[in-house]
Amino acid sequence: IDLMLGIPSEDAKRSYDFMRPLFRDKQSLESFDFPVEYMFKDVPQFSSLGDRIKYTLDEMDKYNIEKALIGVSLSDDVAQSALRQHPDRFLASCGTEPNNGMEDVRNIVRLHEEFDLKAVGAFPAGCVPQVPINDKRFYPIYAKCCELDIPIFVCVGVPGPRIPMACQHVELIDEVMWFFPDLKFVMRHG
């Protein structure tokens, strides 16, 4: 089971627009389509790809990936289709933006009801403004994950994009787990 698989997007550059306000260096602002392109050379382009779901399934088969956790949102028709057409291969997760408050909690509930959400993901350094792992804006999300008995996958440590990392210090997890001992907290990229 792959716990972070993405179905290729038609416009990969647009996929990262949410964090562009955090970029300061010239390469990230002007040159890169992919925010961590400085680490990964020859990033594949998928703009002319036909059936994105079939392509993803073929790649999963090629690498013997039986199932994959994919991100779904209320506006992502491709991920929704993949989950509906291939429930035996794809499992739903959703990203969260704690700056949106209770709107995000309602979104988690709706996606859980509609797609049997298996996890929530968070990228604290990618939030605008950034939100530390132990910030109170995350608490309603942590509580909802406990209530739904699903894990939260949180990016911790140094982020790949050239943005500040203080909000993702692993030490911040300690306080979260003290307040939420039932929370299934998974460190991603840690």
Regions found by a protein language model. Name each.
Residues 4-6, 86, 155, 189:
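Histidine-centered active-site/metal-ligand motif
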Residues 1-3, 70-71, 93-94, 121, ...:
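Active-site neighborhood of phospho(di)ester-bond hydrolases with catalytic His/Asp-centered motifs
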